[in-house]
Amino acid sequence: MGTIFDLKNISYSYVGEITVLKDISFKVDPGEQISIIGSNGSGKSTLLSLLDGLIYPTVGEFYAFDNKIVEEVFDTIKDNEFRSYFRTKVGFLFQNSDVQLFSPTVFEEVAFGPLQLNITPEEVKTRVLEVLEMMELTKLKDRSPHTLSGGEKKKLCIATVLATNPDVLLLDEPTAGLDPRTQLWLTELLQELGSMGKTIIIATHDLELVEQISKRAIVMGEDHRIVVDGDVEKVLNDLNLLLSTNLIHEHMHMHGKLVHEHLHAHDKEHAHEHKN
């Protein structure tokens, strides 16, 4: 398999007026684990939606699996062979779980994707039961998705993505709203999927998750452009970069003659530094 995604000088504007992506260019190769990080409103979720073929560039060119993604071809022609191929290869996790859930039961929710593939009903059932067991959702298979807790809904949404066994996972704020135990479980799952060769791209401002599952970080600035595209360790050790892109912020306090400085991410506990 060649390059998975290739973005060339892409910009995107809502209703042709509000620009949320500016001059975005990068490539994604098979097996990469990438984090797209930036403050709220920097364009992370919009970029993921574009990678999933849900929206199309206002300016520039987007290629997926060496095919140019053009709305007139990708989204409007019935029985589009490449679109079907794309949907089997790429799985998308929405930030808001309720957007992704629509079936009467948990079992039917997970079965929906595999039923669109050319496999037998028996194979669908086997696959669904395996995924439910892996996600620790078997006891909930007859429940309505909308009666589940937030963490259970997130697990279910991940199950619906994994049920079609995609090569590429696009995950929008996957740890948002999860308790610490479920966050740890999800982190370990993503590490395992990465070791299996899955291509994983997440949009997040959870820097701890970025450090644990990614090797490459694409940093979005508040001007909706890519500021840095590079090694995760170098990015996370660059405090000036993290401060300038509003991924961490600092507070200064005086304790007598001691200046007490707090540096912390927006969703994490304070890290402390002292300066005389």
Curated annotation (Swiss-Prot):
Keyword Cell membrane: yes
InterPro entries, per the entry: AAA+_ATPase, ABC_transporter-like_ATP-bd, ABC_transporter-like_CS, ABC_transpr_CbiO/EcfA_su, P-loop_NTPase
GO cellular component: plasma membrane
GO terms of biological process kind: transmembrane transport
Function: Probably part of an ABC transporter complex. Responsible for energy coupling to the transport system.
SUPFAM superfamilies listed in its UniProt record: P-loop containing nucleoside triphosphate hydrolases
Protein name: Putative ABC transporter ATP-binding protein MA_4021
Every ABC transporter domain range: 5-247
Localisation: Cell membrane
EC number: 7.-.-.-
Keywords: ATP-binding, Cell membrane, Membrane, Nucleotide-binding, Translocase, Transport
Family: Belongs to the ABC transporter superfamily.
UniProt main location, coarse: membrane
PANTHER family: ABC TRANSPORTER ATP-BINDING PROTEIN MA_4021-RELATED
Pfam families assigned: ABC_tran
Highest taxon above the source species: Archaea
Positions with a binding annotation for ATP: G38, S39, N40, G41, S42, G43, K44, S45
